[in-house]
């Protein structure tokens, strides 16, 4: 009888603890002005609380009259005293948002929180109407800056950015635009093209293999 009682009591305390944690994170999200909506999402990783958020961004930070759009961001909350890893995705982020088993490597290594930011003009972060004039590196960096400065007051440990492929390039760009926002940047791959036809590899592609293979 006593054993069953203490088991039930332990379960009750666990439920209350998780509920209190959820309420605390959700209160923070409600307090952040840029966050205009969020929903809790389930992941295989039970050590973090995951939320898919909508963040209101200016289409053109230099011209607020141009309007706004909603950008999708995922928060994986580990603890306010833990580091924060910002994934500067260069494209759409459905693979991270929808996969229950997605885990970013640095987040796991550092036992960190995660902010996964989908790039503007991709998937669920596409403005309506879709005016491509506002898809610039400078405007995209302002998106990240707005998100990071909105969350920094709540997470006081170290901040890192990371990305792969175009996300790696984006991580480099962000470091150049706002070096004081982050403590470290870890671009896994960061291709930097000089032009539509870069000029550094075309001559190789014109010679490699046989003519039939190239054609």
Region spans (language model):
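Bacterial Sec-dependent N-terminal signal peptides
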Residues: 1-24, 205-213
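A catalytic-pocket lid/entrance helix-loop region that shapes and gates access to the active site
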Residues: 182-215
């Amino acid at each position: 009888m006593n054993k069953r009682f203490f088991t039930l009591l332990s379960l009750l305390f666990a439920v209350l603890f998780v509920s209190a944690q959820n309420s605390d994170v959700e209160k923070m999200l409600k307090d952040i002005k840029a966050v205009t909506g969020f929903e809790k999402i389930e992941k295989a990783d039970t050590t973090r609380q995951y939320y898919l958020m909508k963040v209101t961004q200016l289409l053109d930070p230099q011209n607020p009259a141009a309007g706004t759009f909603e950008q999708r961001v995922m928060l994986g909350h580990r603890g306010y005293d833990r580091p924060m890893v910002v994934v500067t995705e260069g494209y759409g982020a459905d693979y991270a948002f929808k996969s229950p088993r997605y885990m970013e490597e640095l987040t796991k290594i550092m036992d960190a929180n995660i902010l996964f930011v989908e790039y503007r003009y991709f998937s669920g972060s596409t403005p309506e109407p879709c005016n491509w004039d506002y898809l610039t590196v400078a405007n995209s960096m302002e998106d990240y800056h707005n998100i990071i400065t909105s969350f920094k007051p709540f997470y006081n440990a170290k901040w890192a950015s990371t990305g792969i492929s175009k996300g790696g390039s984006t991580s480099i760009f962000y470091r150049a635009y706002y070096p004081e926002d982050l403590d470290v940047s870890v671009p896994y791959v960061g291709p930097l093209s000089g032009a539509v036809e870069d000029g550094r590899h075309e001559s190789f592609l014109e010679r490699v293999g046989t003519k039939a293979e190239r054609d």
